[in-house]
Structures are given as C-alpha cells and as structure tokens.
Design a protein with these regions (language model features):
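Terminal transmembrane helix and immediately flanking juxtamembrane interfaces
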Residues: 1-259
Length: 259
C-alpha cells in the first residue's frame, strides 16, 4: 500500500478473493461469531461502510493536497472524486432496488398449523401481489427474485478506492513532500480500514455464500472503479473531470514546496 505497484495489482487480488472466497465455506464453522449477521463488525461498519470510507480517506486526501498546495480549490478538486463515487453508489442502489422490485415477488409462508400441507419439509407459499421488497421483508414474509449483493459491491468499491487514493503517498514521500504526524496517522487509519474491508469481504464470502449475486456485486464494484480511475479520471483535471490521485501533488521542489 502507498505505492503504484500495489495500486496496479490490487484489483487482481480482489477479483481472486471474490471468485474463490466462497470456497472457504467448506472449512469455516457456522457456529463462529462471524456467522451471525448481528455481529458488532457487521452492524458498526458494514452498514455504514461508505461513511467510514469518506471520513478517513476524505481526511487523508484533503490534508495531503492542502499540505502541498495550500489551495482549497485543489483540495476540493481531489475530494470531488469521493463525491462522484458516492453519487455512483447511491445511483446503483436505486437501480438495484428498482430491478429487485420489478423482478421479484413476495410470498407468505403457510405453516402446517394453519391446516396447510408441508412439501419436502417446506411450507407452501402464498403469493402477495403488489408488495415491495422492503414492505415484504418488514412484515416477516419471504421475498424471492433477482438480487445483487450490495454489500459485496460496496466493499469492492471501497477497497479499490482506498487503494487508489493512498497509493500516491509513497511517491509523495520519495519526492520530499511535507508529511507531519497527522498525515501519517491518517494514512495508517486508511491501511487499517482497507484491512477491515478485506476481512469483512472474506467473512461475507465464507459465511454467507450466495452465487451468483456476490459475483455480480463484485463485478459491478470493479467495473465502477475501472470506469472512474482507469477511464474518466485519466482525461486529466478540467471543469468536468477531477483528474487522477496525485495530479498536481507529486511535483515537489527541493524545499518541499510544489512547483
């Protein structure tokens, strides 16, 4: 981490984890504390993963860019990449919700207590028309339909974003950029956050395998990263593009000031 070499190859590691991570379910114990969705890590970090990413990565990007140029405009331009990723995340969530509601159906289980037969150990299901997924699940009924794992999508996007935004720190230090204790501490927090996201990704793949929804979610996360960082941002800084991480920051004079 903190190097361009790590940034160039991290997406391959992440793709391998998504493809082969579900195989870990053959060895993990379903009695583990991580096999429960109510675990503290899932509740405290997974449900608000984008917020944690914005707090630590946003603070690091702002402090790094401002310590170089002392320019609020430059700092805001680099921070705008997080805004773009956030809009993309919210937009994908809305689209996925529409797809799930359009392709899925709500069912109410009929237990044998109500005098209904049970087939192969499973109660019959009564179709409920017109119910959305949120309303269906909220009423304790069963939703079946086309789904994409939003958790895997978010974790993949956050992992790749953290790797991209922090990869400039190594070259920045090599060129003599000013780096006080707060900047180094924020970089350390970003490293810890990336490790946590990878760990949660492995936990979801191992303890809650779901094919192909997790594969599709991971693919969407990787495609979003590639479209932004390997596509649009390569056009360079302009009124319609924030540019890649490090642009305008990695040209340092001998005295530690930007050219």
């Amino acid at each position: 981490m903190g190097s361009s070499h790590f940034r160039r190859h991290f997406h391959l590691l992440l793709s391998g984890l998504i493809m082969f991570g579900p195989a870990l379910s053959l060895w993990v114990s379903q009695h583990s504390i991580f096999a429960k969705r109510t675990h503290f890590l899932y509740r405290a970090f997974l449900r608000s993963g984008w917020g944690w990413t914005c707090i630590f990565v946003g603070s690091f990007v702002f402090l790094l860019s401002f310590s170089v140029g002392r320019s609020l405009v430059l700092s805001l331009r680099h921070l705008s990449r997080l805004v773009v990723a956030g809009v993309l995340w919210v937009g994908f969530r809305k689209i996925l919700d529409v797809l799930e509601n359009a392709t899925g159906s709500c069912y109410e289980p009929l237990s044998a207590v109500d005098g209904q037969p049970v087939v192969n150990g499973q109660p019959l299901l009564l179709l409920r028309e017109g119910a959305s997924k949120q309303l269906c699940v909220g009423n304790g009924m069963l939703w079946r339909g086309y789904e994409v794992s939003e958790d895997i999508f978010l974790l993949c996007l956050c992992c790749l974003l953290v790797a991209e935004e922090t990869a400039v720190f190594g070259p920045y230090l090599t060129l003599g950029g000013p780096s006080g204790a707060p900047l180094r501490l924020l970089f350390l927090f970003c490293v810890i956050l990336l490790g946590l996201w990878v760990f949660l990704l492995l936990c979801l793949l191992a303890y809650f395998p779901s094919f192909p929804t997790q594969i599709i979610g991971g693919a969407l996360g990787c495609l979003s990263w590639r479209g932004l960082y390997q596509g649009w941002y390569r056009l360079g800084p302009s009124w319609y593009c924030p540019g890649r991480p490090g642009v305008g920051l990695l040209t340092i004079k001998e005295g530690g000031k930007p050219e």
